[in-house]
Amino acid sequence: MTSVRHYLQFSDLSPDEYHHLFERSRVLKRRQSAGELHRPLVGKVMSMVFEKNSTRTRVSFEAGMAQLGGHAMFLDTKSSQIGRGEPIEDTARVLSRMSDIIMIRTFEQGLVQRLAAHSRVPVINGLTNEYHPCQVLADIFTYVERHGSIKGKTVAWVGDGNNVCRTWLQAAAVLGFKLKVASPLGYELQTLDGRHYGSDVLEMTRDPARAVHGADIVTTDVFTSMGFEAEQAARREAFEGYQVTAELMKQAKPEALFMHCLPAHRGEEVAAEVIDGPQSVVWDEAENRMHVQKALIEYLLLGHRED
């Protein structure tokens, strides 16, 4: 019996598998744009478990499953027994008998790992406080479709060393690029996988200009992520000087791309003239969530495809 593959963090797949996913995403995006039908998942069902609200995650997975010929079911804490304390292990046992694949967006990475450990079908991490692999998968594809391989490039992260930043670090190690992180004291990137990352993979600084200098990608996120609202005032003060401005973008390469996972707060972590400017690819990132997730779902359920 073939073992079930899950996608719980970026390091779960190999460079060759990512190369396949990027090429497959390109094909699926082109087909969708041309109006071609590609429905290899007719009769397949995805259960989507949400403990954290979302716009892009829900819409991209629902639309993606529909385009592949399958169906996606939405479950949240109000409409399921999860909100009443049912163990996630029991939820996994039930959902994996009625679904072909599960996506979960929640708070704790440990919850996702427990779900996967008791599931008969693939589990995809739609977001946790620790990692956001589907977002970074889409971000890197957005770079790849414009400039080719990201290997040997430099990505600058300005702001909170959060789940997206932590996922960028895993991606740097897997795909061979460098991540430069600028964060204020107390909000630095904390690795959780026990790995030591050399200077060829990770550089940390307090200075945004140093991080952005010579970068191919400049990216950031909100200062206060979901679940940390009580810290909003303290965070706003701590992150003063960490806004991505047009002046800061001048430190990057002229062809550098600006990325943001959204939702964005103009005038806080990014200036309006940057996110709405010519170097910004945030809307392409959002769309590409759907395309890369389609490729990922197809790969986890059907394996390597060339059709």
Swiss-Prot record:
UniProt-annotated binding residues for carbamoyl phosphate: 54-57, 81, 105, 132-135, 261-262, 289
Gene3D superfamilies (alphabetical): Aspartate/ornithine carbamoyltransferase
GO MF terms, alphabetically ordered: amino acid binding; ornithine carbamoyltransferase activity
Group of enzyme by EC: transferase
Main localization category: cytoplasm
Listed InterPro entries: Asp/Orn_carbamoyltranf_P-bd, Asp/Orn_carbamoylTrfase, Asp/Orn_carbamoylTrfase_sf, Asp_carbamoyltransf_Asp/Orn-bd, Orn/put_carbamltrans, OTCase_ArgI
Organism domain of life: Bacteria
Binding residues annotated for L-ornithine, in chain numbering: 163, 221, 225-226
Cellular compartments annotated: Cytoplasm
EC number from the UniProt entry: 2.1.3.3
Catalytic activity: carbamoyl phosphate + L-ornithine = L-citrulline + phosphate + H(+)
Keywords: Amino-acid biosynthesis, Arginine biosynthesis, Cytoplasm, Transferase
Pathway listed: Amino-acid biosynthesis; L-arginine biosynthesis; L-arginine from L-ornithine and carbamoyl phosphate: step 1/3
Record GO biological process: arginine biosynthetic process via ornithine; citrulline biosynthetic process; L-arginine biosynthetic process
Family: Belongs to the aspartate/ornithine carbamoyltransferase superfamily. OTCase family.
NCBIfam families (UniProt xref): orni_carb_tr (TIGR00658), PRK00779.1 (NF001986)
PANTHER family cross-referenced by the UniProt entry: ORNITHINE CARBAMOYLTRANSFERASE, MITOCHONDRIAL, ORNITHINE TRANSCARBAMYLASE, MITOCHONDRIAL
Function (record text): Reversibly catalyzes the transfer of the carbamoyl group from carbamoyl phosphate (CP) to the N(epsilon) atom of ornithine (ORN) to produce L-citrulline.
HAMAP family found in the cross-reference section: OTCase
Record protein name field: Ornithine carbamoyltransferase
Origin species: Chromobacterium violaceum (strain ATCC 12472 / DSM 30191 / JCM 1249 / CCUG 213 / NBRC 12614 / NCIMB 9131 / NCTC 9757 / MK)
Gene: argF
